[in-house]
Design a protein with these regions (language model features):
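Phosphate- and other anionic-substrate recognition elements at nucleic-acid/protein interfaces
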Residues: 1-147
């Protein structure tokens, strides 16, 4: 079965990167729009073909004893929770990532493989970086292809 990858960089404005093994696209928008888009992608992919579905989400760490919302309210946490639910609903592998994991992936690396998608808030770039990290960890992509 082929792989279908969806990476999300959550926030009030979120980034989304989708790759089916050959073609890729990215989009940036409000969190609820991106969550809805992830659901439609997972639903379509599960109906059109037998895909191995993968959902990559950037995790969030809450400070201990924090009773106040993060700078974006609770939107980021709600998005991550909804994406976790959608991954389970559609039988996708959930791959949470610490935000720091994408730090070693440069814009030059993304440009080399054709995954540099400029956006005002850089969320599409961040979601592409998360996808690269996941593919490196799964050994689908090799670091030599990026440098």
């Amino acid at each position: 079965m082929p792989d279908y990858w969806i990476a999300n960089d959550p926030g009030v404005v979120s980034g989304l990167m989708v790759w089916d093994g050959k073609n890729s696209w990215a989009q940036e928008g409000l969190a609820y729009e991106m969550v809805r888009l992830v659901e439609s992608e997972l639903a379509a992919a599960s109906q059109w073909q037998d895909w191995n579905l993968h959902v990559i989400v950037e995790g969030v760490t809450l400070p201990r004893m924090s009773h106040s919302p993060a700078k974006d309210g609770f939107g980021q946490i709600e998005s991550i929770g909804t994406l976790c639910y959608l991954a389970q609903k559609y039988g996708a592998e959930l791959l949470p990532q610490d935000p720091s994991m994408r730090k070693g992936i440069t814009l030059a690396m993304l440009q080399k493989i054709g995954w540099y998608y400029p956006s005002p808030d850089k969320h599409m770039v961040d979601s592409a970086k998360h996808l690269v990290v996941a593919l490196l960890r799964k050994r689908i992509l090799r670091i030599e292809e990026l440098i």
